[in-house]
Amino acid sequence: MTNIQLVIKDDSNSITLNVNRDTLCSKIDYFNKMFNNFAESTKEIVSIYVLNAQIVRDLIDSKIYDREITADKKNWKYILDLYKCQDYFGIEIDSELMKDLLVPREYFGHLIDVIDLIGYNKHTVNTVVQNIPIDFNVKVFPPKLINKMVPVITDSIKVFGSKTSIDIVCLKTREIIYSLPTIGSLCNCFCYVKNKKMVFFINELSQLVAFDIRYGTSNIISLRIKKEDFNTNPYYRKNILLTDVLYRRNSDLQIIPTVNILYNKISNQLIFCHNHKHVVIIDVESYRVINMYTHSNYFDVNIDNICRYVNHNTLAINHSSNIIALWNLESYEIHTRPKPNGIINLTALIYYNTYIYKNKFQKIFVNEFYLPNKPFELKPKHSGEITFVGCSPDNKYIVIVVDYCQITIFDMEYTLSLYASCKCVSRTYIRYEYPLSIIFGSNNTMSILFETNKKNIVHVYSLKSKKSLKNYV
């Protein structure tokens, strides 16, 4: 075999290559079959008609010279036609270029045709989810594709409290999947249990609801403490005040969460405050009330909020009086600690004995329950109204947001002295109105929901790099 001229033609272009026939046959099986079984085997000039002449030239060069084809993600049509050409010539397809590819809405069908050629893998399924038009009927997809899409969609879900609803947002498709109506004052009283794909919230009728994201179904949870339950639950009988409350009412106690709802992954339990008087623990599987905490001065003292340290079974209960109660969720032992002067809001537990609080002068402090240390003030870089204080899941970062989402991040390095190693590491200004909701991710990210010009905008912000990673509309 000798050198030949290969003429590559498409509808608008023609490219001629001088190639060695032996090399071409050894690199691409399509040409091996052509030059050994068909009339082209004796020709010195061979013409082929293809979808895109330039892409086929790139393919041939990449195989002959062992070069990788690269393409800008913006050149989506080149990438899709490249895959079609690879399929036509029987060249093994690498779906790496499909990763995070975005195509215009009107070419979504073209994208699906190409993915059918490639097959369903992590890159192609992610790309389908990212490009689905909002009004597209996914029921036309093959069941195999739908089954692979479900975990991709659910894994990219964030749940935010907006003005009158709990919004379930898919960051892959950039849309609100479900909007669950609630009471405005309880729009942030919800709990997203990611491993179960469940959202627990209070609806507009003041009912506790379990919403299954996978199936879009709701289950109203009716929680009642009955007198006869005291015969089977020893924890109830220990709660003398609760017993007294029940018998004074001479009726069952209807349980409705208020303030905030927490999830204890260790024991698979929900924890919340009822009517600002009781802290209730329920089993997530059976929705059975397991235990309740009631302050000794039931009629005069309210429970303002509760906080839990994720890596330790300890719950901090912030009372309207001058104490904070620490409730061990394994032994159910209770220890009380006096509040520092002026505390109005217990914000977070960053260790089993260390907490963040806000005082009546809108100042943020870190303090320890068991050591006589002076509270350490966290001073944000901006002045104004503090709209959010929170701690990342790994307790490494404390975030304070002032006014129009001016963010100050504190790095908490736990060495011998907590306060000597607490320092401000960054500040960022994002030009939007007050954030509607802020939630932390498990990978040191923070998702911030804004409303501007009647549109919801989600910023995903990296606590590690101190940068906005992505914006979703």
UniProtKB/Swiss-Prot annotation:
Q: Which residues form the BTB domain?
A: 2-72
What transmembrane ranges does the database entry give? none
User: By its UniProt entry, which InterPro entries does this protein fall under?
Assistant: BTB/POZ_dom, Quinoprotein_ADH-like_sf, SKP1/BTB/POZ_sf, WD40/YVTN_repeat-like_dom_sf
Q: Which Gene3D superfamilies is this protein grouped with? A: Potassium Channel Kv1.1, Chain A, YVTN repeat-like/Quinoprotein amine dehydrogenase
Organism superkingdom: Viruses
Quote the Pfam families the UniProt record gives.
Answer: BTB (PF00651)
As for family, the record states: Belongs to the mimivirus BTB/WD family.
Q: What is this protein called?
A: Putative BTB/POZ domain-containing protein R765
Q: Which organism is it from?
A: Acanthamoeba polyphaga mimivirus
Source species taxonomy? Viruses, Varidnaviria, Bamfordvirae, Nucleocytoviricota, Megaviricetes
